[in-house]
């Protein structure tokens, strides 16, 4: 046997010692081979990273932490030929950004609803002021622009109309303003078909000063139009007023109101005095809040009188630097009108005003 041949060079070794030597030699050889293999793989990996950067994608749930530490790079984003990265498991996925969501990514509270209240008129009566004032109330959300749905855009449908509205909570009122509704023949029926419970707000003003204000606004946009006197009369010497001119026709409030009373009871229509809105804004807004069935949140503390513009403005909120006042287009200086023309128009409007007072049960004292 071999140990006898080897044993010639020295005394024989015990069997146990030979086994330990064999095991140690084998272990040392395996360790060397493994180390060489790992070094080789590491070198190949480094060369691949230097040649073409690649990123690990789509880690499994069990390996996310490990890959997060060893991930070689962050991709700039998928190319047109490259599929998007798969979404993370549902439990770890962030909430999707929805249309109309806030900056934090969570959906805005509330629902878009059809308006429960409308400011339907009248043009140049003070409707913008009422809208801006009532928007201060926490229980009212109002559309800032005039959608003209019931006069110009009715064919777009109620779903389109609803999509324009601000989101509201169950306890809030949705409101919009379009002054031309009051003189639109089809508007009362269309609003009734939307909801017979709709509350209507009408801001009225002395029809003569309203017509002059209307003309002043038009003149600022079209300086070449005829004079106010020329547009107001078909024959001034005979005192024949041209009721086809819209600035005159709008002020015939009793005539337009008849169309509304065919569909809505007087209790659902609230009339605001444009004159009192200037002299006592808190009082007029208090009555509007009562009509809408909401708390009297807007009071005297919310207003101050702007002497330059000649009407009240909202006091500045704590979060802003400047007071909230209507824009430059509001509070224009009216054009000078011949006093005789004003007297003729007052006489023309007198029977309409009296009938209007009797119908609504209020005396606006325009005579």
UniProtKB/Swiss-Prot annotation:
Residues 1-19 are cytoplasmic. Residues 40-367 are lumenal. Substrate binds at residues 146-152, 177-180, 245-246. It is a single-pass type II membrane protein. The chain crosses the membrane at residues 20-39. It catalyses: alpha-D-glucosaminyl-[heparan sulfate](n) + 3'-phosphoadenylyl sulfate = 3-sulfo-alpha-D-glucosaminyl-[heparan sulfate](n) + adenosine 3',5'-bisphosphate + H(+). This is Heparan sulfate glucosamine 3-O-sulfotransferase 2. It comes from Rattus norvegicus.
């Amino acid at each position: 046997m071999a140990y006898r041949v080897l044993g010639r060079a020295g005394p024989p070794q015990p069997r146990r010692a030979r086994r330990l030597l064999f095991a140690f030699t084998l272990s040392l050889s395996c360790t060397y081979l493994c180390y060489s293999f790992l070094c080789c793989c590491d070198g190949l990996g480094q060369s691949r990273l230097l040649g073409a950067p690649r990123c690990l994608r789509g880690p499994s749930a069990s390996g996310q932490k490990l890959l997060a530490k060893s991930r070689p790079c962050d991709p700039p984003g998928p190319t047109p030929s490259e599929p998007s990265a798969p979404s993370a498991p549902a439990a770890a996925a962030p909430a999707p950004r929805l249309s109309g969501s806030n900056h934090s990514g969570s959906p805005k509270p509330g629902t878009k609803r059809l308006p429960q209240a409308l400011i339907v008129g009248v043009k140049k009566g003070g409707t913008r002021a009422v809208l801006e004032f009532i928007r201060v109330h926490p229980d009212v959300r109002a559309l800032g622009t005039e959608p003209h749905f019931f006069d110009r855009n009715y064919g777009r449908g109620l779903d389109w109309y609803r999509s324009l509205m601000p989101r509201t909570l169950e306890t809030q009122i949705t409101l919009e303003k379009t002054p031309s509704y009051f003189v639109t023949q089809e508007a009362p029926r269309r609003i009734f078909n939307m909801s017979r419970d709709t509350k209507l707000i009408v801001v009225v003003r002395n029809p003569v000063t309203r017509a002059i204000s209307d003309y002043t606004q038009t003149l600022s946009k079209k300086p070449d139009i005829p004079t106010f006197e020329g547009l107001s009369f078909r024959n001034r010497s005979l005192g024949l007023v041209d009721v086809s001119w819209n600035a005159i026709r709008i002020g015939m409030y009793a005539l337009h109101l008849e169309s509304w009373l065919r569909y809505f009871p007087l209790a659902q229509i609230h009339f605001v005095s444009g004159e009192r809105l200037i002299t006592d804004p808190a009082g007029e807004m208090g009555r509007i809040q009562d009509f809408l069935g909401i708390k009297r949140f807007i009071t005297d503390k919310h207003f101050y009188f702007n002497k330059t513009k000649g009407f009240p403005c909202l006091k500045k909120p704590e979060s802003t630097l400047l007071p909230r006042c209507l824009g430059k287009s509001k509070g224009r200086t009216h054009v000078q009108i011949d006093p005789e023309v004003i007297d003729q128009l007052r006489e023309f409007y007198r029977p309409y005003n009296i009938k209007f007072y009797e119908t609504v049960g209020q005396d606006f004292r325009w005579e």
